[in-house]
Amino acid sequence: MNPSTTAMDIEEIRRYLPHRYPFLLIDRITEVEIGSHIKAIKNVTANEPFFQGHFPGKAVMLGVLVIEAMAQAAGILGVKSGRRELGLPDEPEEDGIYFFVGIDKARFRRTVVPGDQLHLDIKIIRSRRGIWSFTAEARVDGTLVCEAEIMCTTAGRGGR
């Protein structure tokens, strides 16, 4: 790994994302190269609360939650990259929140079920006027299960 590539454990992830159980959908960052890409993991367990109703007897992770997991990983990459771009320290703003603001070309290729390990791969396409665009892929056992282009933006002090 080069100096700008690092892994993050759950405690560091919590510093960058406001999400908490049951909506924190990233368990580990295996690689982040600021300004380029991020790789993350979500361990999908039978204990996830959304499996209680989706579907009884045939548990399937909701596709929108796979998208949300990708957006959370993109949020971390965007915050880290944006701060570096501005010459700021690599620390999240205490009251800054990164918002998921758009999605294009979303495709769901296969279901995600308990026991799967979701591998997320997010790459920056561009940033313009505070809006970041990313390509996002989710894989299970090397098989593509979801892909999309997502957009995020940050809200600093005061939530704007």
Where do the protein language model's features map onto the residues?
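Flexible, low-complexity linker/boundary loops enriched in proline and small hydrophobic residues
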Residues: 2-30
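Residues located in well-ordered beta-strands
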Residues: 25-28, 102, 107, 121-123, ...
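RNA-interacting cores
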Residues: 5-9, 39-42, 59, 159
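HotDog/MaoC-like acyl-thioester-processing domains
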Residues: 2-5, 18, 79, 111-116, ...
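Beta-strand-rich interaction surfaces with strong enrichment in secreted/lumenal proteins
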Residues: 14, 57-58, 108-110
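Active-site- and interface-proximal helix/loop "cap" or "latch" segments in soluble metabolic
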Residues: 61-83
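Hydrophobic beta-strand-centered segment that forms part of the acyl-chain substrate-binding groove
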Residues: 3-7, 75-119, 145, 153
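Catalytic strand-loop segment that frames the active site of acyl-thioester-processing enzymes
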Residues: 19-61, 65-66
